[in-house]
Amino acid sequence: MAIEKKFITDGVRNVRVEKFLTKELKRAGYGGMDIARTPLGTQVTIFAEKPGIVIGKGGKQVRQLTQDLATDYDIESPQVEVQQVQNPNFNAQIMAERLANALERGWYFRKAGSSTIRRIMESGALGCEVIVAGKLTGSRSRTQKFTEGYIKHCGEPSETIVEKGYALAIKKLGTIGVQVKIVPPDARLPDAFDVLEPEPKKAPAEPIEPEEVGDDVFEEEFEETSEEEYVEEV
C-alpha cells in the first residue's frame, strides 16, 4: 500500500472510531481518544469523565469495546486503556456534549453559550470560543459565536494549543451543531516570552592601603629576628 493511501485509510478509520466511541460512551462523559502503534499491537487510550462506566462491571464494557474495535474497525490487537479527565472544564469534547445536552433540554442558546464560556474562563483557561449553528429560533438556520480571551484560528498554534470538540443537539426544529475551542492555561502561546531578572552584582572589594611603618619598627623586628637565630645556632 502506498504511503499516501495508508495515511488516508488511517484517517478515515480514526474518524469512524471517534464517531463510534462518542455514541457508545456518551453517558461516561467521553472526552476523546488517542491511537498509537506499539510493538505489541495498537494502543487505544480513551479519555472519559467517568471511567467506571467505560470499564463496566467486571470489565465487561471495555472487553466489548476491544472486540468491536478489532472486528468492525480492523484495528490490529487493540489494547484499550481508560484515563480519567482531570478537569472536564478544559476538555473541549466534554464541554461540547454538555452544551448540546443543555440545548436539547430546552435552554435558550444564548444562555447556554454564555454559561459555557463563563465556566471555562473561570476555571483558568486562556481563551474559549463557542459556535452554535442551526435552527436556533426560527425556520432559518443561523450561526451564533461566543468568544472570550485568546484564540488562535490558523497556523501551527491552532493545531497544537487549541483543544477542539464537536457535538450535535437534536431538537424538534432540526439539528444544531455545537463547536467548542479551548486554550488551556498551560498552553505556550507563540508570542509569549520570559523576562529574566538580572543577577545582583557583587560590590567591588575595597583596595587595601599599605600601612606606613617607620624605621623604628623595622629595626626592632630585625633585632628580634637576629636574637632568635642566634639562640637556635647556639
Curated annotation (Swiss-Prot):
Entry superkingdom: Archaea
Q: Tell me which CDD domains the record gives.
A: KH-II_30S_S3_arch
Molecular function in Gene Ontology? rRNA binding; structural constituent of ribosome
Domain spans labelled KH type-2 = 17-86
Q: Which GO terms describe its cellular component?
A: cytosolic small ribosomal subunit
By its UniProt entry, which InterPro entries does this protein fall under? KH_dom, KH_dom-like_a/b, KH_dom_type_2, KH_sf_prok-type, Ribosomal_S3_C_sf, Ribosomal_uS3_arc, Ribosomal_uS3_C, Ribosomal_uS3_euk/arc
Q: Does the keyword Zinc apply?
A: no
GO BP terms: translation
Q: Which UniProt keywords apply?
A: Ribonucleoprotein, Ribosomal protein, RNA-binding, rRNA-binding
| UniProt xrefs under SUPFAM superfamilies | Prokaryotic type KH domain (KH-domain type II) (SSF54814), Ribosomal protein S3 C-terminal domain (SSF54821)
HAMAP family, A to Z = Ribosomal_uS3_A
| Subunit architecture | Part of the 30S ribosomal subunit.
- Role according to the record: Binds the lower part of the 30S subunit head.
Entry's NCBIfam families? Answer: PRK04191.1, uS3_euk_arch
What family classification does the UniProt entry report for this protein?
Belongs to the universal ribosomal protein uS3 family.
Name the chain's protein: Small ribosomal subunit protein uS3
Species source reads Methanoculleus marisnigri (strain ATCC 35101 / DSM 1498 / JR1)
